[in-house]
Swiss-Prot record:
It comes from Arabidopsis thaliana. This is Subtilisin-like protease SBT1.8. It is found in: Secreted. The gene is SBT1.8. CDD domains: PA_subtilisin_like, Peptidases_S8_3. Transmembrane segments: none annotated.
Length: 754
């Protein structure tokens, strides 16, 4: 017994030692912030200096000079600790953050039939370059046709990289640049690629990057469709703008070290707009690589558009909340793809589908639900269905946990002949169409509840699935997508996020020939276009619109373009009713839709804009509980003077208001507007208050003698007596208007942080 116990103890000690050894020596990618000005004269470049501080030159992944000051390196924890303590020039070290993707009717829906129809933006938008950070590009897509495009702008300093599956000659006057950044990803994957399809190349083997880049600036392609659905002319928002793609997302996600390197390069390459349909959790701005890179872009006049995330309708789920980026949520179009389930009890259930196969004939089939190999058979997870039960039948699957298209594949592989995917409370009444591998439709929660009850109560329930193609002029629209992430902003609650919503449900755009439309390996279909949903799809809409505004108003700053899109956004749908939320069909609010749905026609001439300088953003950062070191990490300056900081972050000259009372009853903000309309203009204010808050604006009238003139006004918000501090929020608006313009700012009120 003693010998056995001793042996067991020895094994335990050895196992523990090996675990600790592996744990302490395991290498990771770290991002290292350095005092840029400390470089000794003995080193010619910062790259040489950084390399000298590492044990091995191969440990250095990227040197950052523009979007960030420092480098990224592949180190173990001991090396990282040693590096931080070895030099006063090393200011901060943190692990490489992982971000995820936020996955042709829209021009007409947005009123872009002819590039606004009032300005000749064709020639001027030729000079606009939109940089897209995503999964790369499929250059053979017809959406990158460069017919009649003039020569590439001389300001362009970028490249089209060759790779094992990508020839630099594939770029042209439309797709002018293509680069890939994979060092962070490769290190996280053990030094190589985790998928046989991936290589060091800008080639898009996922489809997402081709979809987003063609949405932003794809050339017009006639007779486009997705397997017969959404037929028409497919085109991006800025059809004459140039596209530069930066591949930063790979099979396991998008790493901050790669994103920073791409942003660094894109700024130096000369892009005018950066579009990022990706993001992660909320982090302080000094640890948010996207926010850090975007600050440098903004300072150099580059507009940055980011997706809000797909974690809705969960409260406080919005990502990419830095005030110097445009944060974009998603709404529906006035186009739908209806499908029906004709039940054996005579009822007809309405849903949506992009199924394009031969169908299931005219004979109803038996329905089954929640019967299989495990308790999770209701979700149709892999391995959960018993083929002896579902073979030859239609399976009802609850939405959630695994991908929607995977559920259809699980049903098909188990022998099922059809599927009805029914929403639960988490997704409410939102309907997203998918191109399943078998006849399948998606239905909302209420319809799903009726369906589940029918299957349970009928001894032999049956259904016949019917597909009706494409329908236009759907009412009401837009509706806020249930998946679209919501405020309040958890990093700085005094800044309202998201900023706007744009089209993000069932969007047709270009696709990669390397993968089927479902993204599943077993999907052998290939199509030039695909229909996708997500804030990933709404973000490039705004990126393209920003490019058009940049062409129309080259003198406008990124914050002026952002203001124009925000203050002209609308909050009434095509039935003239307030915007609704697809999650539960309730009225939407600014935590879901921000300032509203973008209206590019009105944004072209907003009347007034809220401009914000770099110095004002620094005053904003100084008002946060950040150290000077943290602020320097974001603004990349040798030192920062916070003597003129805002007393409240909400004092930033933002086009919307988010009032956090906390323990106060009175909050007062001053804003400054710039006249970009006509000379001799007069605007009067209209206040739409909230039940628990009094709002007063002084002055109540703004008179402008000239274009470019600036005027200030002050708003006082008073929480009425007797209002208890609760988690509830209330909303209102402040609108400056004259016969030609309405400049609207939403206001959100909260009494505690979250």
């Amino acid at each position: 017994m003693a010998s056995s116990s001793s042996s067991s103890s020895s094994i335990t000690i050895i196992t523990t030692f090996l675990f600790l050894l592996l744990h302490t020596t395991a290498k990771k990618t770290y991002i290292i912030r350095v005092n840029h000005s400390d470089k000794p004269e003995s080193f010619l470049t910062h790259h040489d200096w950084y390399t000298s501080q590492l044990n091995s030159e191969s440990s250095l992944l990227y040197t950052y000079t523009t979007s960030f000051h420092g480098f990224s390196a592949y180190l173990d924890s001991t090396e990282a600790d040693s590096l931080l303590s070895s030099s006063n020039s090393i200011l901060d070290i943190f692990e490489d953050p992982l971000y995820t993707l936020h996955t042709t009717r829209t021009p007409e829906f947005l009123g872009l039939n002819s590039e606004f129809g009032v300005h000749d933006l064709g020639s001027s938008s030729n000079g606009v370059i939109i940089g897209v950070l995503d999964t790369g590009v499929w250059p053979e897509s017809r959406s990158f046709d460069d017919t009649d495009m003039p020569e590439i702008p001389s300001k362009w300093k970028g490249e089209c990289e060759s790779g094992s599956d990508f020839d630099s000659k594939l770029c042209n006057k439309k797709l002018i640049g293509a680069r890939s950044f994979s060092k962070g990803f490769q290190m996280a994957s053990g030094g190589g690629f985790s998928s046989k399809r991936e290589s060091v190349s800008p080639r898009d083997v996922d489809g997402h990057g081709t979809h987003t880049s063609t949405t932003a600036a794809g050339s017009a392609v006639r007779n486009a469709s997705f397997l017969g659905y959404a037929a028409g002319t497919a085109r991006g928002m800025a059809t004459r703008a140039r596209v530069a793609t930066y591949k930063v997302c790979w099979s396991t996600g998008c790493f901050g070290s790669d994103i920073l390197a791409a942003m660094d390069r894109a700024i130096l390459d000369g892009v005018d707009v950066l579009s990022l349909s990706l993001g992660g959790g909320s982090a302080p701005y000094y640890r948010d690589t996207i926010a850090i890179g975007a600050f440098s872009a903004m300072e150099r006049g580059v507009f940055v558009s980011c997706s809000a995330g797909n974690s809705g309708p969960t409260r406080a789920s919005v990502a990419n909340v830095a005030p110097w980026v445009m944060t974009v949520g998603a709404g529906t179009l006035d186009r739908d793809f209806p499908a029906f389930a004709n039940l054996g009890n005579g009822k007809r259930l309405t849903g949506v589908s992009l199924y394009s196969g031969v169908g299931m004939g005219t004979k109803p089939l038996e329905l089954v639900y929640n019967k299989g190999n495990s308790s999770s058979s209701n979700l149709c997870l892999p391995g959960s269905l018993d083929s002896s039960i579902v073979r030859g039948k239609i399976v009802v699957c609850d939405r959630g946990v695994n991908a929607r298209v995977e559920k259809g594949a699980v049903v098909r592989d188990a022998g099922g002949l059809g599927m009805i995917m029914a929403n639960t409370a988490a997704s409410g009444e939102e309907l997203v169409a998918d191109s399943h591998l078998l006849p399948a439709i998606a239905v909302g929660k209420k319809t799903g509840d009726l369906l589940r009850e029918y299957v349970k109560s009928d001894s032999k329930p049956t259904a016949l699935l019917v597909f009706k193609g494409t329908v236009l002029d759907v009412k009401p629209s837009p509706v806020v997508a249930a998946f679209s992430s919501r405020g309040p902003n958890t990093v700085t609650p005094e800044i309202l996020k998201p900023d706007v919503i744009g089209p993000g449900v069932n969007i047709l755009a270009g696709w990669s020939d390397a993968i089927g439309p479902t993204g599943l390996d077993k999907d052998s279909r290939r199509t030039q276009f695909n229909i996708m949903s997500g804030t990933s799809m709404s973000c490039p809409h705004i990126s393209g619109l920003a490019g058009l505004l940049k062409a129309a108003h080259p003198e406008w700053s990124p914050s002026a373009i952002k203001s124009a899109l925000m203050t002209t956004a609308y909050v009434l749908d095509n039935t003239n009713a307030p915007l609704h939320d697809a999650a539960d069909n309730s009225l939407s609010n600014p935590y879901a839709h921000g300032s509203g749905h973008v209206d590019p026609q009105k944004a072209l001439s907003p009347g007034l804009v809220y401009d914000i300088s770099t110095e004002e953003y620094i005053r904003f950062l100084c008002s946060l509980d950040y150290t000077v070191d943290h602020i320097v990490a974001i603004v990349k300056r040798p030192s920062v003077n916070c003597s003129k900081k805002f007393s409240d972050p909400g004092q930033l000259n933002y086009p919307s208001f988010s009032v956090l009372f906390g323990g106060k009853r009175v909050v007062r903000y001053t804003r400054e507007v710039t006249n970009v309309g006509a000379a001799s203009s007069v605007y009067k204010v209209t206040v739409n208050g909230a039940p628990s808050v009094g709002i007063s604006v002084k002055p109540s009238k703004l008179s402008f003698k000239s274009v470019g003139e600036k005027k200030r006004y002050t708003v006082t918000f008073v929480s009425k007596k007797g209002v208890s501090m609760t988690n509830k929020a209330e909303f209102g608006s402040i609108t400056w208007s004259n016969p030609q313009h309405e400049v609207r700012s939403p206001v959100a009120f909260s009494w505690n942080r979250f």
